[in-house]
A protein has these predicted regions:
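Outer-membrane pore/translocation modules
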Residues: 1-104, 149-153, 203-206
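Outer membrane beta-barrel transmembrane domains
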Residues: 98-206
């Protein structure tokens, strides 16, 4: 994990560190299902358990507590649920960073996609994300690169996504889901910019 570049502190130095990062807990996760829509809501907490020192180039964590509130839904356009669209909004609030006066601004992230299901196991479509920093970063000792352009960052991304469900039991009650996503970023303001390639592996065991 390379955290030489982190928000809101931007560093041009390089450094790699290997080990456990910050802890993420989701003590509240609620879901509702209807014939043509699924809804989910949760509260998540990021804890600063990864090693962090202000200005270091080998940090494994971000050195701050973060609270996450999220609400999302998937809407199905036919009875067989083969055509669907989704959107998930998450709001993040952050504490001051460890041993520092720096506080990262509050973030709003919206992500989702539009897709279709083929042969019950393969999903293909387009994914997107939108992210805005709604309040300015604050604190002492910010580098000159950003000290006059604090906060109000934004990033947008759009690209293809493919996922495949592989059954681990005959009745499909246990699944392994492989997901591939590639996003082109655009509309970036006061932030680093680059395309995103992501793979994920999810297990459903009940």
């Amino acid at each position: 994990m390379n955290l030489a570049i982190e928000a809101p502190r931007v560093s041009l130095s390089r450094g790699d560190s290997y080990g456990a990062g910050d802890l993420y807990l989701q003590p509240i996760n609620l879901g509702w299902n209807t014939k043509h829509a699924d809804v989910i809501a949760w509260y998540g907490l990021f804890g600063p358990t990864g090693r962090y020192a202000p200005g270091a180039n080998n940090n494994r964590g971000l050195g701050m507590w973060s609270h996450e509130l999220a609400l999302g839904s998937t809407v199905y356009f036919d009875d067989k649920k083969t055509l669907h669209a989704s959107a998930l909004g998450a709001y993040e609030l952050h504490s001051q960073k460890k041993d520092s006066d720096v506080r990262v601004g509050q973030l709003l992230t919206i992500e989702g996609g539009l897709g279709t299901t083929l042969k019950q196991a393969l999903n293909v479509g387009m994914a997107y994300y939108l992210q805005w920093k709604l309040t300015e970063d604050s604190g002492l000792g910010l580098p000159p690169l950003v000290e006059n352009r604090l906060g109000k960052n934004r990033n947008f991304g759009l690209g293809p996504e493919v996922s495949m469900a592989l059954p681990l039991s005959k009745d499909f009650s246990k699944l392994m889901v492989l997901t591939f996503r590639y996003l082109w970023e655009t509309g970036t303001r006061v932030d680093t910019k680059g395309n995103i390639l992501a793979f994920s592996l999810t297990f459903k065991v009940h």
